[in-house]
Amino acid sequence: MASSRASSTTTKTKAPDDLVAPVVKKPHIYYGSLEEKERERLAKGESGILGKEGLKAGIEAGNINITSGEVFEIEEHISERQAEVLAEFERRKRARQINVSTDDSEVKACLRALGEPITLFGEGPAERRERLRNILSVVGTDALKKTKKDDEKSKKSKEEYQQTWYHEGPNSLKVARLWIANYSLPRAMKRLEEARLHKEIPETTRTSQMQELHKSLRSLNNFCSQIGDDRPISYCHFSPNSKMLATACWSGLCKLWSVPDCSLLHTLRGHNTNVGAIVFHPKSTVSLDQKDVNLASCAADGSVKLWSLDSDEPVADIEGHTVRVARVMWHPSGRFLGTTCYDRSWRLWDLEAQEEILHQEGHSMGVYDIAFHQDGSLAGTGGLDAFGRVWDLRTGRCIMFLEGHLKEIYGINFSPNGYHIATGSGDNTCKVWDLRQRRCVYTIPAHQNLVTGVKFEPIHGDFLLTGAYDNTAKIWTHPGWSPLKTLAGHEGKVMGLDISSDGQLIATCSYDRTFKLWMAE
């Protein structure tokens, strides 16, 4: 036992010869000092040559890949960033020195002038001021001054463009203006006196009279219908004594009819194309001799003719229009005649002096209709530019600009009360204007098609008559402007209308070649 244990012990303590062999240490390799090597290389002068040759050898061997477009200029990149930082620093410095208004509305106006949005989402007044300051620090404060200067210049040029120009008239125009002033002032005094007397009538009496009038108007019926021509009838006008009716036709003929039996009295031949209007002299059939000038008419070829009651041929021609004359109207005195022309002007003719005394521009398109104030002091014109103008004949100035219609104005008329004006337009509406307030006081949605004419009741202006291309004429209360009666019966467009001087008859003429008389039952 002992011997075996001893042998095992001996076995554990002994090891093979190859396991106990000593480890051989490798010798250290010394490459020398880098500093010494560099010093030696510089001493030999081989730095540039060796560097270039080594780089060239590496590129040829394919170990170094360098293309010409991948060169990165470190110094230039750093200088650009430095310039940007300096520019931003200078901008912030300028921004701190810029004074911006604390009024938010003014800040918004400045932003709008610079073409910037006046507000951003979630932006308050303080942020808006800071944004304006930053914008001004970039574009400069002179940009805002230049913008304001340009706005003022454009506004000034726009005002100059909208300025009303006047033709230099002859000395006879000055004489006519003085004559019109002397004529109109007494008539205005008389009208105001009548208005005061009417005001003294008890309210109950006036209300009762108005109710009776409305009842009579609601009972209007077609009293007479007459075929007037082979072509459409464009215009109709009652004589001052309400005993005759003049009609103008597209055939070039003008006809005079007796009222109320509608029998043909005269056929006036002289025009060669569509006749636009024919009107009686204010004193015709009242105090004017039949041999004198009793009517005036105009046509699409620019001709204007004067007629007497005892001849079928024109008494005289008024020359001077080169384009279409749409309407002609007598001044209340009967001395002057107004014509509207498609050359964007209207003209006033003195028939006693037999000359044109006024050639008035002011519309941007053709002038279609004209009306005179019953005092004789004012003239109103409506144009195809959708604007109307009121002119003072005593001074020549445009005293009121009628702006509001969306399309052409085809009819204009003064109320006998002296301060209301009605205009009818291609936008299917009739607007009522007040000379005292210098604005539109009511818009009547009158018809379903363009309005061709408007007419106030000639005595007191107690109602308004309108006609349109929807084949109807309508009567409206004044004041109130509520519908009273629709005059339906024409099979075509209503092209003209009129009210007799006594207010008892209404005439309408149509594209269906007929004219109709309407009378209360």
Curated annotation (Swiss-Prot):
What InterPro entries does the record point to?
G-protein_beta_WD-40_rep (IPR020472), PRP4-like (IPR014906), PRP4-like_sf (IPR036285), WD40/YVTN_repeat-like_dom_sf (IPR015943), WD40_repeat_CS (IPR019775), WD40_repeat_dom_sf (IPR036322), WD40_rpt (IPR001680)
Q: Does the keyword Cell cycle apply?
A: no
Per UniProt, subunit arrangement is: Component of the precatalytic spliceosome (spliceosome B complex). Component of the U4/U6-U5 tri-snRNP complex, a building block of the precatalytic spliceosome (spliceosome B complex). The U4/U6-U5 tri-snRNP complex is composed of the U4, U6 and U5 snRNAs and at least PRPF3, PRPF4, PRPF6, PRPF8, PRPF31, SNRNP200, TXNL4A, SNRNP40, SNRPB, SNRPD1, SNRPD2, SNRPD3, SNRPE, SNRPF, SNRPG, DDX23, CD2BP2, PPIH, SNU13, EFTUD2, SART1 and USP39, plus LSM2, LSM3, LSM4, LSM5, LSM6, LSM7 and LSM8. Interacts directly with PRPF18, PPIH and PRPF3.
- Residues carrying N6-acetyllysine: 26
Sorted alphabetically, which keywords does the UniProt record give?
A: Acetylation, mRNA processing, mRNA splicing, Nucleus, Repeat, Spliceosome, WD repeat
- Location of the protein in the cell: Nucleus; Nucleus speckle
GO terms under biological process: mRNA splicing, via spliceosome
Show me the WD repeat boundaries.
228-267, 270-317, 320-359, 362-401, 404-443, 446-486, 489-521
- SUPFAM superfamilies assigned to the protein according to its UniProt record, in alphabetical order: PRP4-like, WD40 repeat-like
> Function, please?
Plays a role in pre-mRNA splicing as component of the U4/U6-U5 tri-snRNP complex that is involved in spliceosome assembly, and as component of the precatalytic spliceosome (spliceosome B complex).
Q: Which CDD domains match?
A: WD40 (cd00200)
Protein name per its UniProtKB record: U4/U6 small nuclear ribonucleoprotein Prp4
**What cystine pairs are annotated?**
none
Gene Ontology CC terms, in alphabetical order: Cajal body; nuclear speck; spliceosomal snRNP complex; U2-type precatalytic spliceosome; U4/U6 snRNP; U4/U6 x U5 tri-snRNP complex
Task: Supply the Pfam families for this chain.
Answer: PRP4 (PF08799), WD40 (PF00400)
